[in-house]
Amino acid sequence: MSVFVYPGSFDPVTNGHMDIIQRAAKLCDKLVVAVLVNSSKNPVFTLEERVDLLKCAVKGIDNVEIESFSGLLIDFMRKKNSKVIIKGLRAVSDFEYELQMALLNKNLDSDIETLFMMTNINYSFLSSSSVRELARHNGNIDGLVPDCIKDKIMDKFRR
């Protein structure tokens, strides 16, 4: 069984992420969307909230599972018996960072492959930080995030 892992902070999940999830899920038997605890970031949404938002967003995609992890991605990959990392790219600037990470992961485990997927051009401008900024100022996030989580995101910033 082929298991791919799509890691990220997903703070929050956007339609750009969903584009990658939907397309990557067609390439494997199981796609694990891995919500990471990143000590270098201060997420707005808690780990539990990010997992819950993703679970809502992927309802109906049968071969997608949502999990969280901390530590090295390579260790999580081994635990999941996965050899493929999925990374979404919006622009060349994303590629530079992700290439470094892919090479580092390859150095740690030569059996690991990183599959880069370009996001749909309709989402090439979209980031979690832009969604947070819009929501923080009561801006319109319609079409930027899955409908089932839009109100939860806006509610987070109304507090």
Swiss-Prot record:
Q: What class of enzyme is it?
A: transferase
Report keywords, A-Z.
ATP-binding, Coenzyme A biosynthesis, Cytoplasm, Magnesium, Nucleotide-binding, Nucleotidyltransferase, Transferase
Q: Which reaction does it catalyse?
A: (R)-4'-phosphopantetheine + ATP + H(+) = 3'-dephospho-CoA + diphosphate
Instruction: Report the EC number(s), separated by commas if there are several.
Output: 2.7.7.3
- Which residues make up the binding site for substrate? S9, K41, L73, K87
> What GO cellular component is one of the record's annotations?
cytoplasm
**What function does the entry list?**
Reversibly transfers an adenylyl group from ATP to 4'-phosphopantetheine, yielding dephospho-CoA (dPCoA) and pyrophosphate.
PANTHER family, A to Z = PHOSPHOPANTETHEINE ADENYLYLTRANSFERASE
Name of the protein in question? Phosphopantetheine adenylyltransferase
From which source organism is this entry?
Answer: Acetivibrio thermocellus (strain ATCC 27405 / DSM 1237 / JCM 9322 / NBRC 103400 / NCIMB 10682 / NRRL B-4536 / VPI 7372) (Clostridium thermocellum)
